[in-house]
């Protein structure tokens, strides 16, 4: 009896699949380079098996077996990650958590909801909407991503400026450690009982444990949104103005600023042709909405030109369209033809570094890409994220891949030199692992490696992900 047969005897029938189509589907995630390789016909090996547990106990059984046999495990939510965090290996098994999709108790008094980690975001929001609630966590991938994926990649929703990122929504969790032991962290608003173990697992991308259940904070669901939109001739002026709006505590849950290229992409349907665009979105409900909107309007009007609420309404209606466009370009359809690769780079830095980050990264990407666009979308009192989209056109797929690697290398180096972080909410995966030592420093990289080794001495958890290239 093989080790996989032994595991199968410990799990419900049908939990393990070695069907070729299933293995093929689980071979990659949504990393653009992996998608390029697939559509050009590269042989991308699938895992040895796909295991689809339905409970925390079943996950514990799988990891205990994997630890005993030395089998690598690749946790997977919905496969929407864009950094290669769920790339299969023929010697590994993929732990597909999509069957763990139960939405549990909603505590109306505390405004919390218990969920399994395989619950998709759009389904969760539909269920909460029936109760007049929302998590307030709206990533662009909400329809194709899971709660577990949000935690693993340290997700930030489109309303994070007002509602916070996933670490602000996550109150408690259950996770299975690499040896099969179950870790339960009760839901509380905050704790000083030592280092925050919940926060340790946020952004860990399945390298330290598998999160199986979570308790999330909820809030009253906005019934409507009010929008402001202003045009700016200069991106630096736009960024400075949005910083002022953010610090004025106007209650804008959405603050976004587009450079001219991104504004043309996002608002071309409104006949927008020149200049940058700033958006501010205000959820109804909190008192004093009119006064707060007036305060934001005064700040924006001092340096910008009013464009009208239709810009915000258009963005809200089409805010997730890029997911479909990405699939059309990088999928079998190859809407832009062969030799084309599109990707995003979401960095972040202090306000004092934002102009330098914008200029240096845009210049670095433009040296290899045919188009580069950028927007600010997650704003803080101390700084902001900068979300770059870039399109590379090569003479063929191999040339496009070479240009892609060069673009990432030069842009990541530029980000570090300008004082930014190479990822704000997409995670590290395999794509950004080579840049981790520069990001964390040699000592920081050693700390991360030691923590990981303490939890996973056998090195079975998602090998290749978040592996700093340091001297041992």
Feature roles, as predicted:
Residues 1-64, 81-111, 260-269, 314-342, ...:
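N-terminal flexible segment immediately upstream of the FAD-binding catalytic core
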Residues 12-13, 416-428, 452-453, 457-461:
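Alpha-helix capping/hinge segments and adjacent helical runs
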Residues 17-36, 220, 226, 231-410, ...:
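C-terminal substrate-recognition/cap domain of FAD-linked oxidoreductases
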Residues 102-256, 460, 472:
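FAD-binding subdomain of flavoenzyme oxidoreductases
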Residues 181, 432-472:
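Activity-critical C-terminal alpha-helical subdomain
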């Amino acid at each position: 009896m093989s080790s996989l047969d032994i595991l199968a005897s410990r799990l419900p029938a049908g939990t393990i699949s070695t069907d070729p189509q299933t293995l093929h589907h689980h071979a990659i995630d949504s990393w653009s380079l992996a998608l390029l390789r697939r559509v050009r016909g590269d042989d991308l090996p699938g895992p040895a098996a796909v295991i689809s547990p339905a409970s925390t106990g079943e996950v514990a059984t799988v990891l205990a077996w994997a630890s005993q046999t030395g089998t690598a495990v690749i946790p997977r939510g919905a496969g929407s990650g864009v950094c290669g965090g769920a790339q299969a290996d023929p010697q590994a098994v993929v732990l597909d958590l999509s069957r763990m999709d139960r939405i549990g108790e909603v505590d109306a008094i505390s405004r919390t909801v218990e969920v399994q980690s395989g619950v998709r975001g759009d389904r969760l929001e539909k269920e909460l909407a029936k109760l007049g609630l929302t998590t307030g966590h709206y990533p662009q991938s909400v329809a194709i991503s899971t709660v577990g994926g949000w935690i693993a990649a340290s997700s930030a929703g489109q309303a994070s400026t007002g509602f916070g990122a996933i670490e602000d929504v996550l109150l408690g969790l259950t996770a299975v450690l690499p040896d099969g032991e179950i870790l339960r962290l009760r839901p509380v608003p905050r704790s000083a009982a030592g280092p925050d173990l919940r926060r340790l697992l946020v952004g860990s991308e399945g390298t330290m444990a598998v999160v199986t259940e979570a308790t999330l904070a909820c809030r009253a669901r906005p019934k409507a949104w009010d929008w402001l939109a202003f045009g700016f001739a200069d991106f630096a002026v736009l960024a400075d103005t949005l910083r002022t709006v953010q610090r004025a505590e106007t209650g804008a849950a959405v603050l976004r600023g587009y450079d001219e290229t991104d504004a043309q992409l996002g608002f071309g349907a409104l006949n927008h042709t020149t200049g940058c665009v700033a958006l501010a979105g205000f959820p109804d409900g909190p008192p004093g909405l009119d006064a707060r909107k007036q305060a934001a309007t005064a700040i924006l009007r001092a340096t910008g030109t009013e464009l009208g609420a239709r810009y915000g309404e258009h963005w809200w209606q089409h805010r997730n369209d890029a997911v479909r466009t990405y699939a059309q370009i990088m999928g079998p359809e190859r809407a832009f033809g062969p030799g084309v690769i599109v990707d995003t780079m979401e960095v972040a830095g202090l306000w004092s570094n934002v102009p330098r980050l914008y200029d240096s990264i845009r210049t670095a990407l433009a040296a290899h890409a045919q188009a580069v666009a950028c927007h600010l979308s997650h704003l803080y009192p101390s700084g902001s994220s900068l979300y770059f989209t870039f399109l590379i056109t090569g003479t063929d797929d191999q040339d496009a891949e070479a240009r892609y690697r060069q673009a990432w290398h030069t842009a990541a180096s530029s980000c570090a030199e300008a004082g930014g972080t190479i990822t704000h909410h997409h995670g590290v995966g395999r794509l950004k692992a080579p840049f981790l030592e520069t990001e964390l420093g040699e000592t920081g990289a050693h700390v991360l490696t030691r923590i990981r080794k303490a939890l996973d001495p056998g090195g079975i958890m998602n090998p290749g992900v978040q592996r700093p290239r340091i001297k041992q």
